[in-house]
Amino acid sequence: MKTTAERVKYMMMTLKIKEQTEFGLLCGASKSVVYQWLTGRIKSIDAKYAFKLEDSTPFSARWIMLGEGKIKK
C-alpha cells in the first residue's frame, strides 16, 4: 500500500471501523482530517497521529506514516 488513503482504508477495514469519526478518536484526528486522508488531500499522516494509532491499534507507526516496514508491530 503506497498511499496514505490505501493505508487508512486498510486499517479501518481491518479494525472493522465504518465511521471516520470513530477512526479519528483512535488518534486524536478530526473527522475532517480522516476524510482528507481517505481522499488523498492530505498525503501523509503526522507522527503525532501515527504514534497514537500505534498505541491504540496493532499497526506500526513507521508503516502508518511511510508504508514501509512491518504492517503490524
Name what the model sees in each region.
Residues 1-18, 22, 26, 62:
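A short, Lys/Arg-rich alpha-helix, primarily the initiator
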Residues 12, 38, 49, 57, ...:
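DNA major-groove recognition helix of helix-turn-helix
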Residues 28-45:
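Recognition helix of helix-turn-helix/homeodomain-like DNA-binding domains
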Residues 47-63:
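DNA major-groove recognition helix of helix-turn-helix/homeodomain DNA-binding modules
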Residues 63-73:
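Short amphipathic recognition helices of helix-turn-helix/homeodomain-type DNA-binding modules
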